[in-house]
């Protein structure tokens, strides 16, 4: 049974749809650099948003094989390529970001991040996603733990 047609406002981000697997690396001031494996699923329901689920597992060091992060969220598609991201993260953060898509490049900057009482403090996030030669790449910068906006993650994912 075929699903509903893609909402026209989501056409500029249709390149994200599908199941993606890949590898990434991360680091942050005061944190030991690490490598990880990632799985991300992005789908639509016919409404003006894409839904996504993302999970990562560390591939090196003492935590090799352990899940280290997870996200569930929605990429809301607006007029003129404008976007809003609403995401909940397993470490205890909820993020609302806004930005845009141009060709196959998405840039999103946080409007606000809410931390659970037991979570570490994250004050800002910037995400950049782009598709290049069939590979979905991203960079994530954040301001956390009283640090200025600093690179945190980069990954390359392939559609499976």
Regions found by a protein language model. Name each.
Residues 90-94, 100-126:
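Acidic, glycine-rich flexible loop segments
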Residues 59-98:
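Helix-adjacent hinge/juxtasegments
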Residues 1-49, 57-67, 133, 141, ...:
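Amphipathic/hydrophobic helical signal segments and adjacent flexible N-terminal regions
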Residues 22, 51-54, 83-87, 106-110, ...:
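Short hydrophobic/aromatic-rich beta-strand segments that constitute the beta-sheet cores
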Residues 37-43, 71-76, 96-100, 124-130, ...:
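Hydrophobic/aromatic beta-strand elements that line small-molecule binding cavities or substrate pockets
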């Amino acid at each position: 049974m075929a699903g509903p047609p893609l909402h026209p406002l989501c056409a500029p981000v249709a390149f994200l749809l599908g199941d993606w697997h890949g590898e990434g690396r991360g680091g942050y001031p005061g944190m030991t650099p690490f490598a990880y494996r990632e799985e991300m699923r992005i789908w639509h329901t016919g409404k003006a948003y894409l839904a996504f689920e993302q999970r990562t597992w560390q591939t090196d060091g003492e935590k090799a094989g352990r899940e280290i992060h997870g996200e569930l969220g929605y990429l809301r598609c607006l007029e003129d390529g404008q976007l809003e991201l609403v995401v909940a993260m397993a470490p205890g953060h909820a993020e609302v970001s806004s930005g845009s898509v141009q060709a196959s490049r998405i840039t999103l900057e946080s409007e606000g991040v809410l931390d659970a009482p037991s979570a570490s403090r994250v004050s800002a996030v910037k995400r950049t996603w782009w598709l290049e030669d069939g590979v979905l790449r991203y960079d994530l910068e954040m301001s956390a733990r009283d640090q200025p906006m600093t690179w945190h993650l980069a990954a390359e994912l392939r559609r499976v």
